[in-house]
């Protein structure tokens, strides 16, 4: 089996390079790839890549994910998150390939306190959410052999993340204020990548599982409680923090160009049922990532 991965150097793409390697012959591309186009600002180019390589499975981890920046560059966000997805979907349909694509809880309005189901009405609050929803629809309309995974609060050990930012600030400051009225489940790129590899194998044998799924870690937290766990684990690991006071504040305390949903909870029952997997509680992945951070020596 031949697998084509777009967005290989992002948080999820990096982990997909690992998880997909045993599943098939993997060709991984990003915006800088030379031999084949992996640049999502070039829809014709990425579609041509699909037609040239004729993979069995395409995994798209490329996207415009700068939520606030998208507000000031909606055309670019639309190009990366929807137009190029449509181009790939059409090329995949011509060649008979499966397409795996990642979307977001930002397609919902973020109201209430009940986990969103795949069948719930969408109503994005910002440009990022609108363009990701357009990408979903483009794939659904043009390539029936698809898996769309909506996820949320994604983190990875590689690169910057919320935990690293909180730890840096906690070493510098005695007081921190963190938002406590946004709810979701921190979801590791590692978990997404492993679930994707499994789902691909299932889909190839059971094509009827094609469709839209919610995929996040188990449980729910707030950014404030997420930060509190990070600090607790750091202190257990013997890391000295200047922090003595952690305050809980509303979203309104930190105005941003793009509106954020208050309710990012996603119901994952459909995914767990169709792919026969159990999604672990969010704390498990975060603690594992923190342990690796605390024990890694910078050379």
From Swiss-Prot:
Could provide a fine-tuning to achieve optimal pKa matching between active site and substrate, annotated site positions: 104
Name recorded for this polypeptide: dTDP-4-dehydrorhamnose reductase
Residues holding NADH: 10-12, 30, 39-40, 63-65, 128, 132
Cofactor(s) this protein cannot do without: Mg(2+)
Cofactor notes: Binds 1 Mg(2+) ion per monomer. Mg(2+) is important for dimerization.
Assembly behavior: Homodimer.
A cellular-component GO term for this protein: cytosol
Pathway terms, separated by semicolons: Carbohydrate biosynthesis; dTDP-L-rhamnose biosynthesis; Bacterial outer membrane biogenesis; LPS O-antigen biosynthesis
Name of the encoding gene: rfbD
InterPro entries for this protein: dTDP_dehydrorham_reduct (IPR005913), NAD(P)-bd_dom_sf (IPR036291), RmlD-like-bd (IPR029903)
Lineage, top ranks: Bacteria, Pseudomonadati, Pseudomonadota, Gammaproteobacteria, Enterobacterales
Organism: Salmonella typhimurium (strain LT2 / SGSC1412 / ATCC 700720)
Enzyme class: oxidoreductase
GO terms assigned for molecular function: dTDP-4-dehydrorhamnose reductase activity; metal ion binding
EC nos: 1.1.1.133
UniProt keyword Metal-binding present: yes
CDD domains the record matches: dTDP_HR_like_SDR_e
Outcome when changing residue 128 to F: Loss of activity
Catalysed reaction equations from the record: dTDP-beta-L-rhamnose + NADP(+) = dTDP-4-dehydro-beta-L-rhamnose + NADPH + H(+)
Functional summary from the UniProt entry: Involved in the biosynthesis of the dTDP-L-rhamnose which is an important component of lipopolysaccharide (LPS). Catalyzes the reduction of dTDP-6-deoxy-L-lyxo-4-hexulose to yield dTDP-L-rhamnose. RmlD uses NADH and NADPH nearly equally well.
Active site per database record: 128
């Amino acid at each position: 089996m031949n697998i084509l991965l777009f967005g290989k150097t992002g948080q999820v793409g990096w982990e997909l390079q690992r998880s997909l390697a045993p599943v098939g012959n993997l060709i991984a591309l990003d915006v800088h790839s030379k031999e084949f186009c992996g640049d999502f600002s070039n829809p014709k180019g990425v579609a041509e890549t699909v037609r040239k390589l004729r993979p069995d499975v395409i995994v798209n981890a490329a996207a415009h994910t700068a939520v606030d920046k998208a507000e000031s560059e909606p055309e670019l966000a639309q190009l990366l998150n929807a137009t190029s997805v449509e181009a790939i979907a059409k090329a995949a349909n011509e060649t008979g390939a499966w397409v795996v694509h990642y979307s977001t809880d930002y397609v919902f309005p973020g109201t209430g306190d009940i986990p969103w189901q795949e069948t719930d009405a969408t109503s994005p609050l910002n440009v990022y959410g609108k363009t990701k929803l357009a990408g979903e629809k483009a794939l659904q309309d043009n390539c029936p052999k698809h898996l769309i995974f909506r996820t949320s609060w994604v983190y990875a050990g590689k690169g910057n993340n919320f935990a690293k930012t909180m730890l840096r600030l906690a070493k510098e400051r005695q007081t921190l204020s963190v938002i406590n009225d946004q709810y979701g489940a921190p979801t590791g790129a590692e978990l997404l990548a492993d679930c994707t590899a499994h789902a691909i194998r299932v889909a190839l044998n059971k094509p009827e599982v094609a469709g839209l799924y919610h995929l996040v870690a188990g449980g729910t937290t707030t950014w404030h409680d997420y930060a509190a766990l990070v600090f607790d684990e750091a202190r257990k690991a013997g890391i000295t923090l200047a922090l003595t006071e952690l305050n809980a504040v509303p979203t309104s305390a930190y105005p941003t160009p793009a509106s954020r949903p208050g309710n990012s909870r996603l119901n994952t029952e459909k995914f767990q049922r169709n792919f026969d997997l159990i999604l672990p509680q969010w704390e498990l992945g975060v603690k594992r990532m923190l342990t690796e951070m605390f024990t890694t020596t910078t050379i």
